[in-house]
Amino acid sequence: MSNNGADLTFGYISCFVAILLFGSNFVPLKKFDTGDGMFLQWVLCAAIWLVALVVNLILHCPKFWPFAMLGGCIWATGNIAVVPIIKTIGLGLGILIWGSFNALTGWASSRFGWFGLDAEEVSNPLLNYIGAGLSVVSAFIFLFIKSEIPNNTCSMDTTPLITEHVINTTQDPCSWVDKLSTVHHRIVGCSLAVISGVLYGSTFVPIIYIKDHSKRNDSIYAGASQYDLDYVFAHFSGIFLTSTVYFLAYCIAMKNSPKLYPEAVLPGFLSGVLWAIATCCWFIANHSLSAVVSFPIITAGPGFIAAMWGIFMFKEIKGLQNYLLMILAFCIILTGALCTAFSKI
């Protein structure tokens, strides 16, 4: 097998692993109360940073580019909304919506050279356009799928640990998400999923920018590595730094009485590890296939995995109409992913 063929094979294998882990990484958290998600966000990001540290040591500590941290900051900002999204519209539908907008944003920025990037070319542009277009179509179909999320009773069994020791203070164990009406649940959940998807789709822009400008002698990034995984430590450091800043701001806003859920620590850590491994696979896929190919594939696939969890494990999606819409959306996603994959060959 030629080097190019080996790269393609390795890239598609990386895509498969990333899809499987991205679609499953929030499953450990589903059975635990996570409150408003701010504490969980910090735990998850701490686990992500530890994985990055291990990868960085394995790669013998490549040069650290601070600008690559910006992508991590963008991702952490979008990730704040994950818990509210899951609580309002469910795991399956949430990942389906934000994955579709993630795909569109990431693909368009690479294909057309947004944000100062070099526009990427593919062997068959028509197939690539069709693949990206089908991702957009699937996103609109997902918006019509209704998920059934159990109402949170806000029992004292799920009261945050830290509030049990506060004397003469009355705190509502419910988060703001739990107080939303059914109609507002769907509006807020879908809106947050779209915003998170756009932010997620922009997360690799700083790294691709550095790689593109490393080929120019007059750039401050001249000579920078072309291997995407060399930037994982800077990227993940940006994630952890940003999540820490947000968590401290949250503690200040809560007057030093944040809602901490100790039972969510280990599941949150596991979720972070799964996400970090999946993202490392995505970095490898970007290097082997290019972002214009990897984005539509990796961002569309996890929705299928998450929806299977939502249907068979958590019973979030029910009814013949919803099942038919899901099947239609999956067929569109599969067709789009195949078109995108073959556009590289």
From Swiss-Prot:
Membrane-crossing segments per the record: 8-28, 39-59, 64-86, 93-115, 125-145, 190-210, 232-252, 264-284, 292-312, 323-343
Record SUPFAM superfamilies: Multidrug resistance efflux transporter EmrE
Regarding the membrane, this protein is recorded as: Multi-pass membrane protein
Subcellular location(s) of the protein: Membrane
Cellular component annotations (GO), alphabetically ordered: membrane
- Read off the InterPro entries from this record: Sugar_transport, TMEM144
Q: What's an example of a GO molecular-function annotation for this chain? A: carbohydrate transmembrane transporter activity
Which terms are listed as keywords in the entry? Answer: Membrane, Transmembrane, Transmembrane helix
Q: Which PANTHER family match?
A: TRANSMEMBRANE PROTEIN 144 (PTHR16119:SF17)
The entry's family comment says: Belongs to the TMEM144 family.
In Swiss-Prot or TrEMBL terms, this protein is called Transmembrane protein 144
Whose protein is this, by species? Answer: Homo sapiens (Human)
